[in-house]
Every structure is written in structure tokens, then in C-alpha cells.
């Protein structure tokens, strides 16, 4: 018998389909809640809904995200606000509400989806990587605040994941997947859940991703700038 699921999304058709599939395949309760998590009121609404329904949330997974390839000066301010609220504000408030309930019960698990870009200077998504750096530091600090009360906090730092986020041809997807640049979402999810259940503080899945993070950390900024200006590398960065 697995965990019952509360799934939240702003895509109602896909949300209902996923919930129905979970009920059928795993014989669990799967509740679908339509919400725009970029709204600042969303976290409180979800917490209040769970309270009113009597749903005790043992595991909180903050995974909602959006990606927009655009330099900062070419990005509309409204889009910047949406990304910041979705990644930073809502995650923080969800952890505030549900984290307090977990603390009072003396048990719980939180998984926060950051990104390998939290460690990297990534041109064309400076706004995105900055929000992921916030989540990195937030998750690390929150672990210190909650682990003594029986609540674990795990931060996940995947690289590029093979999802519709990236507008790639089938040939390019296949090539990047074979090189380990693109990871299967199922593999990332499985490793993230495993790390969370073992109480790990952090996980960067994938050898390629770990190597990139280490290399970028030790290279001088001027050298890294020269490398990312090389045309094939620049074009690849703009696509993944």
C-alpha cells in the first residue's frame, strides 16, 4: 500500500488524467486540485483545503516550475515576477504552513526541486538560476531548523531533464540523452524520492551534471566566459 496523493496543477485536463491513472494503477486515493501556484494566495489555499478535508500531509514535494530562455533585459517584468513567485514565494509559504504541521507531529519529509543551475552562471536564464539558488540556500537552512523535530528536508539538483521544457528535435533529444546530458524524468524522480526517504540533505543526479557543476566551480570566470562564447556551446546552452 503506497501513499495517497494530492496532485496540484494549473493544467486541469492533464491533472485529472494523472489522478485517474494513479487511482487505477495503484489503488490509492488521488485528489486533483486545480491551482495556479504562481499566485501568492495558492499556498494558504492548499493548506486550508487539506485542513478542511482532514488530509494529513506526511510528504511535501515542491516541484512546480517554469523555464523561459531569455536574457534578463529581454524578459518582461511580469514574467520575472511570475517565475519568482512560483519558485520562491510559493515554495517558501508551502514549507511554512506544512512544515509547521510536520514539526508539531514530530515527523515529515520535504523535497524541494532546485536545479544544477543553482551552482552555475547560466546565460539566457539568469532569472531562473537565481530562483534555484534561492531554493538551494533555503532548503539547506530549513534542514537545520526542522531536522531536530523529525522533519527531513532534501534539495534535488538535476541538470537538463527530457521534458517538453526543451524545444528539441527527436534526433537532438536522442543524442543528448545518449550522452547523459538529458536525463529521463522517471530516473530523476526515482533518485529524488529515494534520497528523500533516506533523509539525505541534497542530491545531484547524473554523472554529467555533477562533472559540469564541479568544472564550472573551479574554472575562473574569464575562462568560463570564453568557453560559453564558443558558437556550438552557446547554441546548445540556448536550447537546453
What are these regions, as identified by a protein language model?
Residues 3-17:
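Conserved glycine-rich Rossmann-like NAD(P)H-binding loop of the short-chain dehydrogenase/reductase
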Residues 115:
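Residue(s) in the substrate-gating loop at a strand-loop-helix junction
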Residues 12-13, 34-45, 77:
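The beta1-alpha1 cofactor-binding region of Rossmann-like NAD(H)/NADP(H)-dependent oxidoreductases
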Residues 144-208, 236:
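SDR active-site lid
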Residues 71-72, 76-84:
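Substrate-binding pocket helix/loop in short-chain dehydrogenase/reductase
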Residues 95, 131:
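Active-site helix of classical SDR
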Residues 63-68:
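Conserved NAD(P)H cofactor-binding loop of Rossmann-fold oxidoreductase domains
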Amino acid at each position: 500500500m503506497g501513499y495517497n496523493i494530492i496532485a496540484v496543477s494549473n493544467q486541469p485536463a492533464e491533472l485529472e488524467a494523472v489522478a485517474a491513472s494513479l487511482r487505477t494503477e495503484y489503488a490509492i486515493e488521488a485528489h486533483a486540485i486545480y491551482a495556479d501556484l504562481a499566485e501568492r494566495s495558492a499556498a494558504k489555499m492548499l493548506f486550508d483545503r487539506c485542513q478542511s478535508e482532514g488530509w494529513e500531509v506526511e510528504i511535501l514535494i515542491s516541484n512546480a516550475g517554469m523555464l523561459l530562455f531569455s536574457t534578463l533585459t529581454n524578459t518582461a517584468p511580469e514574467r520575472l515576477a511570475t517565475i519568482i513567485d512560483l519558485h520562491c514565494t510559493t515554495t517558501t509559504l508551502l514549507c511554512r504552513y506544512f512544515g509547521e504541521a510536520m514539526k508539531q507531529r514530530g515527523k515529515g519529509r520535504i523535497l524541494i526541486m532546485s536545479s544544477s543551475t543553482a551552482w552555475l552562471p547560466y546565460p539566457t536564464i539568469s532569472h531562473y538560476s537565481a530562483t534555484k539558488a534561492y531554493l538551494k540556500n533555503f532548503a539547506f537552512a530549513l534542514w537545520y531548523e526542522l531536522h531536530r523535530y523529525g522533519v527531513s528536508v532534501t534539495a534535488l539538483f538535476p541538470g537538463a531533464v527530457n521534458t517538453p521544457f526543451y524545444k528539441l528535435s527527436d534526433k537532438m533529444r536522442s543524442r543528448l540523452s545518449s550522452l547523459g546530458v538529458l536525463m529521463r524524468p522517471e530516473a530523476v524522480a526515482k533518485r529524488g524520492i529515494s534520497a528523500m526517504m533516506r533523509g539525505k540533505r541534497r542530491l545531484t543526479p547524473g554523472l554529467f551534471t555533477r562533472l559540469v557543476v564541479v568544472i564550472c566551480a573551479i574554472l575562473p570566470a574569464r575562462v568560463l566566459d570564453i568557453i560559453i562564447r564558443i558558437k556550438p556551446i552557446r547554441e546548445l546552452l540556448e536550447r537546453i
